[in-house]
């Protein structure tokens, strides 16, 4: 932390908050599997996996993985892969954990926060578990807390979704300060490959101007590659 504090004097430090899931190798998950009091209900565990056929996720693997906890078998929620299990935000202790974590980062000079895979955060039975109102409320809370600490903070949401869904994370200027502009990379690639900028120009002209204190986070590729879903609309 001494090094981070030193760097923050001359640079704006950005942190990736992996808020949706954790590795099964993490100490938090191992404590959960061992059914320790401080980690009980930290991750989503179910006895019945029926009623989740509508769930939208960018993977074809099974949504659930079986684990034994206290000599009982449970289905654990794995949005992305079976070595990553999703946090249970219906447990207030999980939210408090992340608030404390972000506060620690703030105290040590971090001022920009990227919320990883935030769109999948909240889960409800018989829904698609994507962009749910509760997820937006968590983003609003994070924005409020950051603003209370310092006006020099930024909140960025990573939501690799169709364009209109992505833009919803600006809220009423009370959620993200910036959203990843996920439609740009595939449209730019199409333009270069086809030698035709029509689609790119049409999209750019349709984009609403960013409101005060918000912006689009433009990029041309990421570690996840270039997805096509953001071009759906």
Region spans (language model):
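Hydrophobic residues within beta-strands of alpha/beta enzymes
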Residues: 113-115
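Catalytic-core regions of glycoside hydrolase
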Residues: 198-199
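Acidic/aromatic-lined carbohydrate-recognition and catalytic surfaces
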Residues: 1-99, 103, 107, 118-192
């Amino acid at each position: 932390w001494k090094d981070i504090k030193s760097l923050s004097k001359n640079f704006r430090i950005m942190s990736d908050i992996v808020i949706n899931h954790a590795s099964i190798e993490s100490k938090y998950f191992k404590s959960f599997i061992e059914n320790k009091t401080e980690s009980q209900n930290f991750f989503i565990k179910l006895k019945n996996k029926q009623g989740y056929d509508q769930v939208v996720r960018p993977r074809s693997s099974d949504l659930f993985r079986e684990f034994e906890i206290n000599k009982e078998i449970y289905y654990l929620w794995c949005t992305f892969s079976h070595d990553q299990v999703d946090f249970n935000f219906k447990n207030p202790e999980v939210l408090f954990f992340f608030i404390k974590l972000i506060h620690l980062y703030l105290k040590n000079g971090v001022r920009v926060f990227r919320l990883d895979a935030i769109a999948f955060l909240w889960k409800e039975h018989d829904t698609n578990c994507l962009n749910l109102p509760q997820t937006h409320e968590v983003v609003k809370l994070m924005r409020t807390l950051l603003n209370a600490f310092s006006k020099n903070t930024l909140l960025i949401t990573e939501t690799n979704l169709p364009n209109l869904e992505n833009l919803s994370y600006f809220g009423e200027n009370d959620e993200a300060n910036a959203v990843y502009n996920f439609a740009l990379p595939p449209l730019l690639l199409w333009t270069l490959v086809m030698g035709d900028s029509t689609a790119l120009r049409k999209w750019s002209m349709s984009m609403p101007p960013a409101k005060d204190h918000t912006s689009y986070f433009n990029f041309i590729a990421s570690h996840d590659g270039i997805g096509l879903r953001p071009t759906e609309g």
